[in-house]
């Protein structure tokens, strides 16, 4: 028999969302007539907008012609999409991003998990707590985290608590981290950061030769003025930061799969001997070796997101979800819950009632209200006693779910 990668055995038992599915399945089998409302995993419910559908239909028709057929495309992405991303997502902010600095992929989850492959396995990793589990689990798999302790923390990770007391803004660590994961608007807390805070992170990264991995998958949900949409709004960030963006929640592409990662040419890593290496070139080598590119049809759909009509339709979808978020926030607040997020992000982070643990609160909502959310402890030890609800449900389901919860 071949030896296995034993780092996989260090993973916490059961990834968060499969564990939720398991509990819901058990309940459903015992209560087959129960109407369960799911406000847990962040999958969208609205259909793809017409502009995107039309573009994909036309692209599909092209594929059925001799002159319009596309086989393997450029792994980095078609130029028409790269240009749209550079012009609309960054040019509109006054940020110059070259097409060669953008890599189109099949999802931010994949990018966040794969990017660690280009860094040394002895790199010191810093994550917020609570945190999107993929950041931690992929580094566990790579062998960077050490063993898990009785408190649920891995011995070789730097945890940066994001709590009510610090406004869910993780404090900059006193020790040196090689890789720092940041996510804004934040999953799971639904909170945002400030430009001043990002400046401090960029300064820290420069001082410590660190790389910031900036997950901005929910940028399109920002509604308040002054909230930074990209870390590259901060001067010097191109020298220290990689940014992740996605069409999944912005345009409902969870079933189509399209995202992108930005790695500026200025960004460097180093070898053990101290030689500088372009991270853009390194990722390009990895990307073209392990990935054949997103389909032509999907990329034409993504391009349509940037058309005037596409933007208008997508904003209507985003407004629908954020109206759900407001309903959740307002309903829970009226019922006496302590609530965070849900203003610039589609997630609401709430304190559990009666000092229940996160999983006990999950079971309470499932068994008494038939509502499914996400236990905060699944995002890290600092998430214990909290709970995440998603605004991606249907309007009528959200309204019924809040009515059920507030009647408990």
From Swiss-Prot:
Post-translational modification N6-(pyridoxal phosphate)lysine, affected residues: 249
The keyword 4Fe-4S appears for this protein: no
The protein's annotated pathway: Amino-acid biosynthesis; L-lysine biosynthesis via DAP pathway; LL-2,6-diaminopimelate from (S)-tetrahydrodipicolinate (aminotransferase route): step 1/1
Catalytic activity: (2S,6S)-2,6-diaminopimelate + 2-oxoglutarate = (S)-2,3,4,5-tetrahydrodipicolinate + L-glutamate + H2O + H(+)
EC number in record: 2.6.1.83
Positions contributing to pyridoxal 5'-phosphate binding: 72, 108-109, 132, 187, 218, 246-248, 257, 292
Enzyme kind, highest EC tier: transferase
Function, in words: Involved in the synthesis of meso-diaminopimelate (m-DAP or DL-DAP), required for both lysine and peptidoglycan biosynthesis. Catalyzes the direct conversion of tetrahydrodipicolinate to LL-diaminopimelate.
UniProt-listed PANTHER family: AMINOTRANSFERASE
Stated family: Belongs to the class-I pyridoxal-phosphate-dependent aminotransferase family. LL-diaminopimelate aminotransferase subfamily.
Record note on quaternary structure: Homodimer.
This protein's name: LL-diaminopimelate aminotransferase
């Amino acid at each position: 028999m071949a030896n296995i990668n034993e780092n996989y055995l260090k993973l916490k038992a059961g990834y968060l969302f499969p564990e939720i599915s398991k509990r819901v399945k058990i309940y459903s089998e015992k209560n087959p007539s129960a109407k369960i409302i799911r406000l847990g995993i962040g999958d969208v419910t609205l259909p793809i907008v017409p502009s995107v559908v039309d573009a994909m239909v036309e692209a599909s028709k092209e594929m059925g012609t001799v002159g319009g057929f596309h086989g393997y495309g450029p792994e980095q992405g078609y130029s028409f999409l790269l240009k749209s991303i550079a012009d609309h997502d960054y040019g509109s902010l006054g940020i110059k991003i070259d097409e060669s600095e953008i890599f189109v992929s099949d999802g931010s989850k994949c990018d966040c998990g794969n990017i660690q492959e280009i860094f040394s396995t002895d790199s010191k990793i810093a994550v917020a707590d609570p945190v999107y589990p993929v950041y931690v689990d992929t580094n566990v798999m790579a062998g960077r985290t050490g063993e898990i302790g009785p408190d649920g923390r891995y011995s070789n990770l730097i945890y940066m608590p994001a709590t009510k007391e610090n406004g869910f803004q993780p404090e900059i660590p006193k020790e040196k981290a090689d890789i720092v994961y940041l996510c804004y608007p934040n999953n799971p807390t639904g909170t945002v950061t400030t430009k001043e805070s990002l400046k401090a992170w960029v300064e820290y990264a420069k001082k410590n030769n660190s790389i910031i991995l900036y997950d901005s998958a929910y940028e399109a949900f920002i509604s308040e003025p002054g909230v930074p949409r990209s870390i590259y709004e901060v001067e010097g960030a191109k020298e220290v930061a990689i940014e992740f963006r996605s069409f999944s929640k912005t345009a409902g592409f969870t079933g189509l799969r399209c995202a992108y990662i930005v790695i500026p040419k200025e960004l460097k890593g180093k070898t053990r001997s101290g030689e500088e290496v372009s991270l853009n070139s390194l990722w390009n080598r990895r990307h073209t070796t392990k990935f054949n590119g997103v389909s032509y049809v999907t990329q034409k759909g993504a391009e349509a997101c940037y058309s005037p009509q596409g933007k208008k339709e997508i904003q209507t979808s985003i407004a629908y979800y954020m109206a759900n978020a407001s309903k959740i926030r307002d309903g829970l607040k009226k019922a006496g819950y302590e609530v965070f997020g849900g203003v610039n992000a589609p997630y609401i982070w709430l304190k559990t009632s009666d000092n229940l643990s996160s999983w006990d609160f999950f079971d309470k909502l499932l068994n008494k209200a038939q509502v499914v959310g996400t236990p905060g402890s699944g995002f890290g030890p600092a998430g214990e006693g909290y709970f995440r609800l998603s605004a991606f449900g249907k309007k009528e389901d959200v309204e019924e779910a809040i009515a059920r919860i507030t009647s408990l």
